[in-house]
């Protein structure tokens, strides 16, 4: 029996984003309302931090995405609002996406590796 049970939700029960293996960041939206004591992952992580003595406010998934974009240059052009816009229309954005008007990067390392340590043919 577990000492601690974290009452997480499935993807269909929460809001947020996910990144797939082609670096595409897409929105997920709550499809069903649930009853009971389950919580979104971000709520669980924040509660663990608070209980360990690292006080943090409870943020929405949009606020977390905005913070990620503010500290991670390759995500600087990604936000919930942009992912929800007609411009993106459910396709998502592929990082690096370095500015609010950047279209995303479908192919990385064209011709060479970003650090110049190898060669792509």
Task: For every predicted segment, state its role.
Residues 65-121:
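Long, low-complexity segments enriched in small/aliphatic residues
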Residues 1-77:
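Non-catalytic alpha/beta scaffold blocks inside enzyme catalytic domains
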